[in-house]
Amino acid sequence: EHGKMSLVNDKGQTEQVSYQKWTIRGDSLAKEKIRVDEEYPSIRYALVRADEKTYGVYNQAVFSPRDDAAKEFENRIFHGLEALLRYKENGSTLDLAGHEKIMGVDYYFIDVTDKSGRKTRFYVSSKTYRVMMIDYQEDGVKYRRKFYDYNYAQGTLVPYHTILTANDKQIEETRIMTVTFGQKVDDELFKNGS
């Protein structure tokens, strides 16, 4: 997957980031190998989740990312669409939490709670059966990710545009440029040198 993100930094300024993401599927989300290379205007580094650990790579040197950066990266993994699509493999529980009309759209609410206690609410359109948004909480902050521009990529329906808010303030906007499934990914991308 290759795309662009607009991120709001600690100072409230928006930064444009190009990213490239590689994934090797595991038996569950916790066992997957995921690497995201991020290129900011002034720096380029990678965040990697492999062997149930998160670490960074900068100029081929391994580093421990800040706690907030690691948590944000892990939230993209564990509070994403895959949490619902792969709930059985993850050992998660599903609860149908109701049905409601919000701003003219009829939604089913599905709560997914994984083995680690992470809870994500999915808002599924009763008309299209697509996930239109998700909610989760982390450290007292309410996050909401909205999904837009669903299109097919190799027979898989993918939201090409997402917006993440924290306590109703936009902190991230992502636009996928290209996505490819089924390609061989070199395992060396996920080596941490230990």
Residue ranges and their predicted role:
Residues 2-4, 8, 25, 37, ...:
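A structural detector for beta-sheet-dominated domains
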Residues 105-192:
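Gly/Pro-enriched, hydrophobic low-complexity segments
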Residues 25-30, 99-106, 153-154:
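Short, ordered beta-strand-loop transition motifs
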Residues 17-18, 93-96, 145-147:
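Short structured motifs
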Residues 53-118, 126, 138-141, 185, ...:
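Flexible, processing/modification-adjacent segments and terminal tails
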Residues 20-25, 50-53, 69-73, 125-128, ...:
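A short, sequence-level motif marking secondary-structure junctions
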Residues 1-61:
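N-terminal mature ectodomain segment of secretory-pathway/periplasmic proteins
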Residues 1, 34-36, 54, 94, ...:
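Well-ordered beta-strand positions enriched in small/hydrophobic/aromatic, beta-favoring residues
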